[in-house]
């Protein structure tokens, strides 16, 4: 069984910095530590409200990341233009609401097909690999395929939030079927949102998944154990699930 990759999201290093308006901690420094510990890529989300990652972070990390930058953005002219200037390896298009604590659901590709297809083409023409953050629904997966985006990131939030065994099993099966279908129509499948050290293995065990993007759990663990160990422990759990 092939290995699975880990993209470490360092947004919440920036959250800690912005809480006091200081110049530290620096997400670029955190990205370097995460890479040294085995991260296969670094994910950052430049939100329209700039609540954590700032424009400067994006430009600095575009020059300092040694693995791959995955830039999450809303489908807006401002964000697409920033992506075109920065030229990260990957752009993941995500839904965004200013009042949300974190991304609450998947992108409605089926309902915004023309707009998302246009953004995907613009980014792809610039040599950027495009991923769409969507729920594991067949209609959304078909729409994602129609945009020409080569990647999807399956939203695992409902699974992560489930509290009963029945609900967990139901959400896990929903994701499993979505992942298999996405792979069957030629999409490269990533996954993420709400994954942590106690729920990651069943997702990582799905052999069709190429990469998991995980942030909050790793940064939270880093506050206790240090970032190097937090990344290594997550990567170990993921690889154990593939053994």
Swiss-Prot record:
Gene3D superfamilies: Aldolase class I (3.20.20.70). The active site is at 45 (proton acceptor), 72 (proton acceptor), 193 (proton donor). It is found in: Cytoplasm. 3-amino-2-oxopropyl phosphate binds at residues 9, 20, 194, 215-216. SUPFAM superfamilies: Pyridoxine 5'-phosphate synthase. 1-deoxy-D-xylulose 5-phosphate binds at residues 11-12, 47, 52, 102. It holds the Pfam family PdxJ. One of its GO terms (molecular function) is pyridoxine 5'-phosphate synthase activity. This is Pyridoxine 5'-phosphate synthase. The lineage of its organism: Bacteria, Pseudomonadati, Pseudomonadota, Gammaproteobacteria, Alteromonadales.
């Amino acid at each position: 069984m092939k290995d699975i990759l880990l993209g470490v999201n360092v947004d919440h290093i920036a959250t800690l910095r912005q809480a006091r308006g200081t110049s530290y901690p620096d997400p670029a420094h955190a990205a370097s530590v995460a890479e040294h510990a085995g991260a296969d890529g670094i994910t950052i989300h430049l939100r329209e409200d700039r609540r954590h990652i700032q424009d400067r972070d994006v430009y600095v990390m575009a020059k300092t990341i040694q693995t791959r930058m995955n830039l999450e953005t809303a489908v807006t002219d401002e964000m697409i233009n920033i992506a075109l200037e920065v030229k990260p390896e990957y752009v993941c298009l995500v839904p965004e609401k200013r009042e949300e604590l974190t991304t609450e659901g998947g992108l409605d590709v089926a309902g915004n097909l023309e707009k998302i297809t246009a953004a995907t083409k613009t980014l792809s023409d610039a040599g950027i690999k495009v991923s769409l953050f969507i729920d594991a629904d067949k209609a959304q997966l078909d729409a994602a395929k129609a945009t020409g985006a080569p990647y999807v990131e399956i939203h695992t939030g409902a699974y992560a939030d489930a509290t009963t065994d029945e609900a967990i099993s139901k959400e896990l099966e929903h994701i499993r079927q979505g992942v298999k279908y996405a792979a069957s129509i030629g999409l490269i499948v990533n996954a993420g949102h709400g994954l942590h050290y106690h729920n990651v293995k069943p997702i990582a065990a799905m052999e069709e998944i190429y990469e998991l993007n995980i942030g909050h759990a790793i940064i939270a663990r880093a506050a206790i154990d240090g970032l190097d160990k937090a990344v290594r422990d997550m990567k170990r759990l993921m690889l154990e699930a593939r053994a």
